[in-house]
């Protein structure tokens, strides 16, 4: 799992 990608996605959602 790409945590960096997940963090980026969460940032976009926020």
From Swiss-Prot:
GO CC entries: extracellular region; membrane; other organism cell membrane
GO BP terms in the entry: chemotaxis; defense response to Gram-negative bacterium; defense response to Gram-positive bacterium; innate immune response; positive regulation of chemotaxis
Effect of residue 9 to P: Decrease in both antitumor activity and content of alpha-helix conformation
Tissue occurrence: Expressed by the venom gland.
Compartments it resides in: Secreted; Target cell membrane
UniProt similarity note: Belongs to the MCD family. Mastoparan subfamily.
Protein name as annotated: Polybia-mastoparan-I
Species per Swiss-Prot/TrEMBL record: Polybia paulista
């Amino acid at each position: 799992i790409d945590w960096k990608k997940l963090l980026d996605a969460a940032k976009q959602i926020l």
